[in-house]
Amino acid sequence: METLRVLHNLIRWLILVFAFWTVISAISGLASKRAYSNSDNRSNLFFMIFMDIQLLIGLIIYFTNGWFESLKHIGESMKDPMVRFFTIEHSVMMIIAWILVHAGRISVKKAATSQSKFKKSLLYFGIALLIILIAIPWPFREAIARPWFRWF
C-alpha cells in the first residue's frame, strides 16, 4: 500500500508539470495567434494519461485504505476535517478534474481552428488545474497536510 501512496504522490508532480505546460501553451498560443502544434497536443495527451493513471491508483487507495468505509458513518465523518477531506472533498474534486480533462481533450480534438483549440484548452484544462490545486493536500494545509514528497 505504501508503494501506491508513493506513486500517487510522485504522479501528482507529473500531472502538475503537464497541466501547467498545457495551460501556458494555451495562453501563449492565444496571445501569439500561432498554429496549434504537435507539442500542444502532446502536453494535454500526457496530462490526460497521467490523470487516468492517478485516478486508478487513487481509487485503489480509496477502497483499500478505509476511506470508503467512512461513508457508512457519514455524520461522524463530516465532523473530522481530515476524514471529510479524503472521503468526500478530495475524491469528488479530483473526479471532476478528471472529467474536465477528458472533456477538454475531446473538445480540443474536435475544434476546427487553432484559436478555438487554444480557447478550449485554456477553459477545460485551466479549470481542471485550478480544481487539482485546490484538491491537493499541500503541506501548508494544517488539518489535511501531506508531505511535498512521500518516500518509502
Predicted regions and their residues:
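Membrane-embedded alpha-helical bundles that constitute the cytochrome b-like, heme-associated redox core
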Residues: M1-F152
